[in-house]
């Protein structure tokens, strides 16, 4: 069985590329189905048996399993062509940024990702939920088989073990906390600022929690669905507005945090230019936590706008890394043990067909001898004599194959079989 993880993440590709290959959450199932069709129609049919796609703001990865052999470079090429075709991008733009991890390295990578060891925010918990969602969608799309299903179940168990037995998530600085710290570099006190959150998902909820603790002058949630926005805003004594109202109200806000699932930018250059003019060039602090990005990159060039992306926040979230190094070492040790256990399971799975054949062959021998014994009993033969014949017949049939193989073998092959057979049959020799 061939296992593989192919993708790009925040360490190999800039956000400008990651946003182009991100899959919206509601399209993951369709993407998995498309990936399996894509690999299946290739000449080698490499990695077409099982597939799952993980897509977050920091990574897009495809996990695959196949009985067909295939090289790492071939797998990278196939994945690059698939991503390029699916997202309508040039192949040459993607290929240099992709990595491929085969076999135990793929398993180790999945375990590390789910445990938060491969995240921009070391130990952050959101990635585990995102991976579980990705696996559910892959399963619904028919992408999971025996191997990926088992790998991901063990992945989730390892992540739980790491978080329960180490302090990997302790003292970490989250994206939400980093956003607050950055804003405090621009404004002396957040208590005098109006804060706007665009979106109503988990990341916005985390950010709102951190900013609300600073007692801002006002807190507003802008969302496509007003009811959902109002529900979140009520928790923080804020108010909600529709996204459609954003162009007219943007000028009222000093701090803007955006994280939606939109495939296109929500805030454009013209909108912000008009807002800055209405604010009489009072500074505006903006954080775009979305991938694809919610805020057009050109906005960052405006003199009175301080725009940060998820990559810009990377330096802040490394705070406390040295203090957590011991936890990282502990987590890596747990992961390594579980990787070896899973690879042993895969090796054991390789002999399952052989064991099944042995059972089927033995069952056929048993049925033949049993039928013969029944016929003898029906004729009135002595029961002890029939049982004796039955046992001898079964013994002869079971030993016929090994004896024939040993007699037909020559040289080193005979020596090898002669040493192996006593182990298989547990004889005294």
Curated annotation (Swiss-Prot):
Q: Which residues bear the site annotation Important for activity?
A: 109
| Enzyme class (EC, first level) | oxidoreductase
Asked if DNA-binding is a keyword of the record, the answer is: no
Q: What is its EC number?
A: 1.2.1.70
* Active site, per annotation: 57
Residues holding NADP(+): 199-204
- Extra information: During catalysis, the active site Cys acts as a nucleophile attacking the alpha-carbonyl group of tRNA-bound glutamate with the formation of a thioester intermediate between enzyme and glutamate, and the concomitant release of tRNA(Glu). The thioester intermediate is finally reduced by direct hydride transfer from NADPH, to form the product GSA.
Q: What's this protein's function?
A: Catalyzes the NADPH-dependent reduction of glutamyl-tRNA(Glu) to glutamate 1-semialdehyde (GSA).
PANTHER family to which the protein is assigned, alphabetical: GLUTAMYL-TRNA REDUCTASE (PTHR43013:SF1)
Q: Describe its partners and assembly state.
A: Homodimer.
**Which keywords, in A-to-Z order, does the entry hold?**
NADP, Oxidoreductase, Porphyrin biosynthesis
The pathway to which it is assigned is: Porphyrin-containing compound metabolism; protoporphyrin-IX biosynthesis; 5-aminolevulinate from L-glutamyl-tRNA(Glu): step 1/2
Q: Which organism is it from?
A: Herminiimonas arsenicoxydans
Name used for this protein in its record: Glutamyl-tRNA reductase
Q: Which BP terms in the Gene Ontology apply to this protein?
A: protoporphyrinogen IX biosynthetic process from glutamate
Any one GO molecular function term: glutamyl-tRNA reductase activity
Q: Which family does it belong to?
A: Belongs to the glutamyl-tRNA reductase family.
Keyword Repressor included in the entry's annotation: no
